[in-house]
UniProtKB/Swiss-Prot annotation:
Essential for cell growth. Inhibits early G-protein signaling events following pheromone stimulation. Inhibits the folding activity of the chaperonin-containing T-complex (CCT) CCT2 which leads to inhibition of cytoskeletal actin folding. Plays a role in cell cycle progression in G1/S phase. Present with 7700 molecules/cell in log phase SD medium. GO terms for cellular component: cytoplasm. Gene3D superfamilies: Glutaredoxin (3.40.30.10). Belongs to the phosducin family. The gene is PLP2. The modification Phosphoserine is found at S35, S62. GO terms for molecular function: actin binding; G-protein beta/gamma-subunit complex binding. It comes from Saccharomyces cerevisiae (strain ATCC 204508 / S288c). Interacts with the G protein beta-gamma subunit complex (STE4-STE18 complex). Interacts with CCT2; this interaction leads to inhibition of CCT complex mediated actin folding. This is Phosducin-like protein 2. Disruption phenotype: Impaired growth, cytoskeletal disruptions caused by actin polarization defects, and abberent nuclear segregation caused by misoriented mitotic spindles. Cells are enlarged or do not bud, caused by cell cycle arrest in G1/S phase. Coiled coil: none annotated.
Amino acid sequence: MQNEPMFQVQVDESEDSEWNDILRAKGVIPERAPSPTAKLEEALEEAIAKQHENRLEDKDLSDLEELEDDEDEDFLEAYKIKRLNEIRKLQERSKFGEVFHINKPEYNKEVTLASQGKKYEGAQTNDNGEEDDGGVYVFVHLSLQSKLQSRILSHLFQSAACKFREIKFVEIPANRAIENYPESNCPTLIVYYRGEVIKNMITLLELGGNNSKMEDFEDFMVKVGAVAEGDNRLIMNRDDEESREERKLHYGEKKSIRSGIRGKFNVGIGGNDDGNINDDDDGFFD
């Protein structure tokens, strides 16, 4: 007995039908590709959710007051308390505020040990009763004032010390720190944290050389972790009066964020060459 002939049945795999659903379930035809529209909607939903979650991160207390009519009262009050606690902790750590000029015998205490923070001072507990041994960022300038870049770095240190009072800025003449330290390596910038050297930089080439500005130095501070990228004290985050007024107008016209987002898809409209310290000098910085 001959086998019955096989008939080739043409199936439109893109068709949304009950028969195609059966074939997909049995693996006869592949699953339908996700709709591009559905993918776009999902991506937009995720973007909106992330924006909503982080909407208050860059707001200061005055900004939070302006949002009282738009935000859930309990949520906003809890967030204000969180921000106040952050400000209080920053104030507790803001104990420097100047550039400290030291000599070699003071280096270990004023730099290495100081960078250990509360671990060096003695373990303390935070508001939750947990031990707090947070370190301190210490920036050290091995200086030679006859060099232009060293004078530039001294000026940057002075400005940064006044603004970021929780960071310790220390300056020491390079030849006092290390005998016969090469003048070509000056200025040298060393960053300590929790007793360790986490970054060193020979001359200001990495910042911009003779054209180094405060914005460049602040960017460096962010990169080494000494300052948070969203810190309102940074020049790049500072609002001028015009942009602040625009932001007030923007939030004044917006409906409550927590009441739901309508029309949410209408978006988009309207030293060494390698910058390291010579091995012979490593022992001094431990």
